[in-house]
Amino acid sequence: MADNSSDEYEDENNKEKKKTSQLTPQRGFSENDDDDDDDDSSETDSDDDDEEHGAPLEGAYDPADYEHLPVSAEVKELFQYISRYTPQLIDLDHKLKPFIPDFIPAVGDIDAFLKVPRPDGKPDNLGLLVLDEPSTKQSDPTVLSLWLTENSKQHNITQHMKVKSLEDAEKNPKAIDTWIESISELHRSKPPATVHYTRPMPDIDTLMQEWSPEFEELLGKVSLPTAEIDCSLAEYIDMICAILDIPVYKSRIQSLHLLFSLYSEFKNSQHFKALAEGKTAFTPPSNSNSQAGDAETLTFS
């Protein structure tokens, strides 16, 4: 039994040695193959580099074309920087994102189909003699005629105007409010009436100019005359017009008209409104005390 077991053990060892002897050359062959692959890849990379650097682009910079230039050494050194420069390759990522725009409903005007021709073929002169408006909000014919008369400035032409009347006006206050609002809008849009003076009068812009510093300094010490002064109305008008450089003639109507026109311009001016609001918003106590002191000195003097 012992001899048989020893023989079997030797046979197994011989088989393992044969296997190792067969595997060793294959391993050497595989290592050589890896080296060959590395050599091939390095050769292909070098070939690619040679192709990139060896084949110059059309119109590229060639240093040999500029060697014969009669320039100084400093300029030649500058030419060397051209070949040293390597541009940076930046890959820009273009991302296309599909999007759906927001849905915006567009509702058109309601068409009342008033442009349909008449069955008898006669022209209805729509838009020429009759105003073409949507049927949802029609204009009042009386108010429209007043607007046209005001814009055309033909007030003396006698024409037939429709007079609007309301039945049971107490039960329809909305129509009355609409009429009042439309007439008020008509009056607000009217331009100011142009008045031609028979006597020479200064312009409004001239009267709105600033006073001289001496006169403003005097107004800071002496206040303007108020209506409580002991004088007649005619004398008070002459006094105020003289302060504002408005000429006064025998009839003071034109002078008063110019005075009130000047007051209206100052009242509606945005510049002077801002100044008035700024003065009312900020009133330093020092100025008030100084003015009070000036008033007291004037009073006691």
From Swiss-Prot:
GO cellular component labels: cytoplasm; intraciliary transport particle B; microtubule organizing center; motile cilium
Disordered: region residues: 1-63, 280-301
Polar residues bias (residue ranges): 283-301
Composition-biased stretches (Acidic residues): 1-13, 31-52
GO BP annotation list: cilium assembly; intraciliary transport
Keyword Phosphoprotein: yes
Lineage: superkingdom: Eukaryota
Record carries keyword Repressor: no
Cysteines engaged in disulfide bonds, as pairs: none
Keywords attached to this entry: Cell projection, Cilium, Cytoplasm, Cytoskeleton, Phosphoprotein
Subcellular location: Cytoplasm, Cytoskeleton, Cilium basal body; Cell projection, Cilium
Phosphothreonine modified-residue sites: T283
Biological role stated in the UniProt entry: Forms part of a complex involved in intraflagellar transport (IFT), the bi-directional movement of particles required for the assembly, maintenance and functioning of primary cilia. May play a role in chondrocyte maturation and skeletogenesis.
Subunit structure: Component of the IFT complex B, at least composed of IFT20, IFT22, IFT25, IFT27, IFT46, IFT52, TRAF3IP1/IFT54, IFT57, IFT74, IFT80, IFT81, and IFT88. Interacts with IFT57, IFT88 and DAW1. Interacts with ARL13B. Interacts with IFT56. Interacts with TTC25. Interacts with IFT70B.
Family the UniProt entry places it in: Belongs to the IFT46 family.
Protein name: Intraflagellar transport protein 46 homolog
Organism encoding this protein: Bos taurus (Bovine)
Highest classification ranks of the organism: Eukaryota, Metazoa, Chordata, Craniata, Vertebrata
Gene it is expressed from: IFT46
